[in-house]
């Protein structure tokens, strides 16, 4: 872009950080909120909530910039990504690097308000976010790595609330890995032909004709692990009701993706926001129900 105005430049940064597409923030935020509430004996501390919500927005935005930096030589060959700011020249490589660094720095300053264990965990969290885009070059299922990166707020949440990393935090993280493989395979089914042409790896390519089966199997593993967490943490019936609603949402996704229509697969991917929300409502309701019983 030649001599862009301030408004045009800010709009380009807005698109680069995907703030115009909040689904990524929500898919990152829901597991973090599950972790915060499941780790808390009651309503979580306000500072912890603020740091994690703001940090989620900042690091998801930074991750999008890092992703586009890594993929800038590929995105022009993919129909869905050829208008990204780094491809069109609306944002320079130097500007993108500085933006990613600035966002990460602000997120780190927020983390410094919490305990030393959370601060220590922020370093592998940053590494996961920065390295994920490169895994599409050599991992057959980079979506599994994405699940770890997107779910790392879970052990950080337990560390912030309890000062420890109990087994439940890691089970919840593993559950999130299966969920991420499920929803990001739906996403990858949209780009499969383009990814094959440019040599990018994805779970949709790896699973091939078994892609739909793999997605549903991952949903199943995710829900089983979430139920295990609920049993271990002695959650009340609304938690498991939330899992039941999530299972119905997953079945709806099967109806969307079984014919492998690109638009329907993308719709299923976006719809995972409601699956995450259903579980969070179940977590909140379970906490309220248990508090009501204890107060009697």
UniProtKB/Swiss-Prot annotation:
Function: Catalyzes the prenylation of para-hydroxybenzoate (PHB) with an all-trans polyprenyl group. Mediates the second step in the final reaction sequence of ubiquinone-8 (UQ-8) biosynthesis, which is the condensation of the polyisoprenoid side chain with PHB, generating the first membrane-bound Q intermediate 3-octaprenyl-4-hydroxybenzoate.
EC class (word): transferase
Main location: membrane
Taxonomic superkingdom: Bacteria
Statement: the UniProt record of this protein carries the keyword Repeat: no
UniProt name for this protein: 4-hydroxybenzoate octaprenyltransferase
An example Gene Ontology biological process: ubiquinone biosynthetic process
Gene behind this protein: ubiA
Keywords: Cell inner membrane, Cell membrane, Magnesium, Membrane, Transferase, Transmembrane, Transmembrane helix, Ubiquinone biosynthesis
Biological pathway: Cofactor biosynthesis; ubiquinone biosynthesis
Segments traversing the membrane: 23-43, 46-66, 99-119, 141-161, 163-183, 211-231, 237-257, 265-285
GO MF term list: 4-hydroxybenzoate polyprenyltransferase activity
EC number of the protein: 2.5.1.39
Family designation: Belongs to the UbiA prenyltransferase family.
Reported cofactor(s): Mg(2+)
GO CC annotation: plasma membrane
Subcellular location as annotated: Cell inner membrane
Pfam entry (one): UbiA
Membrane-related topology note: Multi-pass membrane protein
Reaction equations catalysed: all-trans-octaprenyl diphosphate + 4-hydroxybenzoate = 4-hydroxy-3-(all-trans-octaprenyl)benzoate + diphosphate
Species in which this protein is naturally found: Methylobacillus flagellatus (strain ATCC 51484 / DSM 6875 / VKM B-1610 / KT)
């Amino acid at each position: 872009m030649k001599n862009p105005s301030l408004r045009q430049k800010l709009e380009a940064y807005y698109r680069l950080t995907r703030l115009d597409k909040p689904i990524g923030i929500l898919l990152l935020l829901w597991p973090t909120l599950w972790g915060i509430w499941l780790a808390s004996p009651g309503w979580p501390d306000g500072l912890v909530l603020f740091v994690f919500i703001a940090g989620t927005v900042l690091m998801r935005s930074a991750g999008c910039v890092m992703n586009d930096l890594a993929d800038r030589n590929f995105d022009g060959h993919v129909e869905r990504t050829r208008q990204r700011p780094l491809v069109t020249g609306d944002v320079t490589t130097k500007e993108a690097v500085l933006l990613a660094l600035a966002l990460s720095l602000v997120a780190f300053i927020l983390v410094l308000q919490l305990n030393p264990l959370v601060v220590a965990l922020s370093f592998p969290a940053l590494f996961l976010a920065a390295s994920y885009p490169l895994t599409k070059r050599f991992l057959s299922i980079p979506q599994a790595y994405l699940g770890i990166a997107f779910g790392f707020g879970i052990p950080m949440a337990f560390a912030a609330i309890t000062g420890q990393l109990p087994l439940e935090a890691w089970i919840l993280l593993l559950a999130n890995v299966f969920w991420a493989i499920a929803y990001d395979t739906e996403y990858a089914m949209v780009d499969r032909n383009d990814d094959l042409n440019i040599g990018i790896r994805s779970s949709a390519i790896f699973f091939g004709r078994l892609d739909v089966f793999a997605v549903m199997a991952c949903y199943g593993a995710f829900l089983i692990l979430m139920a295990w967490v609920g049993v271990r943490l002695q959650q009340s019936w609304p938690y498991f009701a939330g899992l039941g609603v999530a299972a119905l949402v997953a079945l709806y996704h099967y109806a969307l993706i079984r014919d492998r229509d690109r638009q329907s697969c993308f719709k299923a991917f976006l719809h995972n926001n409601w699956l995450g929300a259903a579980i969070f409502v179940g977590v909140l309701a379970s906490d309220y129900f248990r508090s009501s019983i204890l107060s009697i």
